[in-house]
């Protein structure tokens, strides 16, 4: 047997000449002994080689580009736990400044020095906090009135992101869904009100629907809800899920009323790591005033050296994202954010217009209000096509593009769509490359003599396994 004892794999040995590189990476058990940092780094890095480049991932909403100074700041704070406010008091102050800035972007009426809000790991936790606050306010009022409080519900469109399903299950709150249709592509206020009753804790309109990219009309909902509450004597509030739109609307549509300018909007949540332009995970939630944040949501501990009060589902959380958000606010300012979001929107509109020119496709909506949109195969084209959008997804992935194909939610599940999310770091030149690859893929698919497996599955009404995460959640398989 060959003697390999001469190979110790120490720091002087070339990485690929080390004996550790002859062993597979650990799957079930921690290795018996240590290795050099160079080898460990290379092994972990090699595990990611088969992935797409993040900036070519048009499925994700998550920020995939920040400048070198932002990255440097965040790396320098990577070992700081935000919850240790006694040791890192300036981080806590910076967090408060970010909440102030976000709340004022949403036209907060609060006069206090520090606005009412909370840091979150992402928009999901922010949504949860907004929902829990609405539930606790409703429950407290019902208890004071001596009425039952065991059957709470909330109303939302079928375009909801998966966190709301989690919220309903975890807190045992009924989720009443208003169906989206081709005729009613956003939340219909009147249909939403039909689902309300004395047990409704809130209505949740969405700004930047994950599935479609559209915005619910919050102003119309607020107006209809005001009349409904006056008629019934209820005081059903609105929580706005602005995971994407919360950092788009203030800069591109400042005149549009969707925020705290509206009477019944009491809380708003947003993702900082989407169009807030910060690496994950970061989210924010703000309330119209302190009276709308129940005291029982604040928890205090003293084992960190002082009494620390926090609002959140998570306890420990990274401080680096706070620095990243505050840096972006200072670095870009209002005008800089406006320019970045404007460019993303214009590139999305450009791709939208080019997709409309392609024979097989039709866009779901005529306009693009956020930097994302969806399209599907024309029904007449799909009848004779030997391929599906799942096949186009696979073709594009061969060129590094991640463009998800998926079915729309309930009542629209017969429609398979594709979606593009344009983010900071995606240029017009990259858009042209994408469009070129789409055209080339279509040309190849149209040469097929026989139907693809996904096309045959569609014809037999069999489920097709979704191969790419679309950030909508809810389903592992789709019908068509």
Language-model regions, residue ranges each:
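Non-catalytic terminal extensions of PLP-dependent enzymes
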Residues: 1-100, 104-111, 132, 138, ...
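Conserved PLP-enzyme active-site core in the AAT-like
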Residues: 7-12, 118-299, 304-307, 320
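A short glycine/serine-rich beta->alpha loop
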Residues: 26, 82-87, 113-121, 270-273, ...
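A short small-residue
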Residues: 74-81, 201, 205, 324-331, ...
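Secondary-structure capping and boundary motifs in well-ordered enzyme cores
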Residues: 90, 119-126, 156, 160, ...
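Structured alpha-helical segments in the cores of large, soluble enzyme domains
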Residues: 95-103, 160-165, 188-196, 314-321, ...
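Hydrophobic alpha-helix feature that most strongly marks membrane-spanning transmembrane helices
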Residues: 200, 204-205, 226, 230, ...
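Active-site C-terminal subdomain of aminotransferase-like
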Residues: 251-370, 376-381
């Amino acid at each position: 047997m060959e003697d390999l004892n001469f190979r110790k794999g120490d720091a002087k040995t070339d990485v690929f000449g080390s004996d550790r590189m002859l062993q597979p990476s650990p799957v079930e058990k921690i290795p018996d002994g240590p290795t050099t940092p160079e080898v460990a780094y290379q092994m972990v890095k090699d595990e990611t080689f088969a992935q797409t480049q993040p900036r070519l991932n048009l499925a994700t909403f998550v920020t995939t580009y920040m400048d070198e100074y932002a990255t440097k700041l965040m790396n320098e704070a990577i070992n700081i736990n935000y919850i240790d406010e006694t040791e890192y008091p300036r981080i806590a102050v910076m967090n408060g400044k970010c909440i102030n800035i976000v709340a004022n972007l949403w036209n907060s009426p609060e006069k206090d020095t520090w606005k009412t809000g909370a840091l979150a790991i992402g928009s999901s936790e922010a949504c949860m906090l907004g929902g829990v606050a609405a539930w606790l306010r409703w429950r407290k009022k019902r208890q004071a009135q001596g009425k039952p409080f065991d059957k709470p519900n909330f109303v939302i469109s079928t375009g909801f992101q998966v966190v709301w399903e989690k919220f309903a299950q975890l807190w045992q709150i009924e989720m009443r869904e208003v169906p989206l249709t081709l005729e009613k592509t956003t939340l219909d206020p009147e249909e939403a009100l039909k689902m309300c009753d004395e047990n409704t804790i809130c209505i949740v309109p969405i700004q930047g629907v994950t599935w479609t990219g559209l915005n619910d009309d919050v102003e119309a909902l607020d107006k209809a809800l005001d009349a409904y509450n006056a008629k019934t004597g209820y005081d059903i509030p609105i929580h706005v899920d602005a995971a994407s739109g919360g950092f788009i609307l203030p800069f591109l549509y400042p005149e549009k009323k969707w925020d705290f300018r509206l009477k019944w909007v009491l809380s708003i949540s947003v993702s900082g790591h989407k169009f807030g332009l910060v690496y994950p995970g970061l989210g924010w939630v703000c309330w119209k005033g302190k009276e709308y944040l129940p005291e029982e949501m604040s928890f205090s501990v003293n084992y960190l050296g002082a009494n620390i009060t926090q609002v959140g589902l998570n306890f420990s959380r990274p401080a680096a994202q706070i620095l990243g958000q505050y840096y972006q606010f200072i670095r870009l300012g209002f005008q800089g954010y406006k320019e970045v979001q404007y460019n993303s929107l214009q590139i999305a509109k450009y791709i939208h217009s080019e997709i409309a020119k392609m024979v097989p496709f039709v866009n779901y909506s005529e306009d693009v209000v956020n930097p994302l949109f969806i399209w599907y195969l024309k029904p007449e084209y799909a009848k004779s096509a030997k391929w599906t959008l799942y096949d186009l997804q696979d073709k594009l992935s061969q060129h590094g593009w991640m463009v998800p194909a998926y079915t729309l939610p309930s009542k629209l599940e017969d429609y398979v769509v594709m979606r593009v999310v344009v983010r900071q770091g995606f240029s017009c030149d990259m858009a042209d490359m994408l469009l070129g690859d789409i055209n080339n893929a279509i040309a190849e698919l149209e040469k097929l003599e026989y139907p693809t497996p996904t096309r045959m599955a569609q014809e037999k009404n069999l489920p097709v396994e979704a191969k790419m995460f679309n950030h909508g959640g809810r389903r592992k398989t789709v019908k068509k």
